[in-house]
Amino acid sequence: MKVLQINMTDMFSTGNIMLNIAKKARERGHEAYTASKKTRMSMCQNRKDPYHSYIGTRTEHTIHRYFSWMTDLQDFGSVIATYELIHKIKKIEPDIIHLHDIVGWYVNIGILFNFLKIYNKPVLWTFHDCWAFTGRCIYFDSVKCDRWKTGCGKCPQIGYMPKSWYFDLSAFNWKRRKKLFTSIENLTIISPSKWLKELSDESFLSKYKCVVINNGINLEAFKPTRGGIYDELKKLNKKIVLGVASTWSKRKGLEDFIKL
């Protein structure tokens, strides 16, 4: 089986998830390809992987990003990059296309999803945030907004990534995404948590099956141990709350941890 995964990055959390899935798929005898946006850190890493390809150029990404910031017409850029990606898809002829994060100013979702509709092969889409069913936001819980259920508009997070400098076209973007994303017949959504699944089930994507597959953990590295710091912590005879984040913010509960 041939599988192609597409993600915003080949690094960090979602990038590593994509690459680890590809690695496991190859170990089981499948042809696993990956594609991602080429970032500055990707260039420094200089990945030499015959199964990986980069989408677009740094110049295209920059133009796309500034166009989005100035107009709030998200994901209308990267036309050439998206057609080049489609050419690669046709060349690989994958049996399954697995999407991850497609926000990030590197693909034109209109061109991509119109192609996926015609290509008519199974599409998996792993949600790593809420962007797919909103008009802009990747998260909305910190501002307690539920406009994503009815069509967005009057966005309270216009300055939050992916931001807009001047306009609020979140209602237009919401309608456009609904039309594009619900046009795919054979689509299965994957959520890493029950919480995100429940949100997806309340959105315009509720007609699609959403399966919870938790992010994997390397049990060789993360496992119960005795001795060392365990013994020191046990001596304290206190309840310990552990939280981990790549970068802490109010939305990720930093203030709650401080209160605890």
Which residues fall in each region the model found?
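Carbohydrate-associated surface elements
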Residues: 195, 216
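Short N-terminal targeting/anchoring amphipathic segment
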Residues: 87-107, 121-128
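Acidic anion/phosphate-binding donor-loop and adjacent secondary structure
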Residues: 201, 217-232
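Conserved donor-binding/catalytic core segment of Leloir-type glycosyltransferases
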Residues: 190, 232-252, 258
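N-terminal subdomain of nucleotide-sugar transferases
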Residues: 1-47, 92, 118-122, 185, ...
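A conserved catalytic-core segment of Leloir-type glycosyltransferases
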Residues: 26-96
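A short, basic/aromatic alpha-helical/loop segment that forms part
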Residues: 12, 219, 248-253
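Membrane-proximal helix-turn-helix segments that form the acceptor-binding/catalytic region
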Residues: 87, 118, 131, 147-189, ...
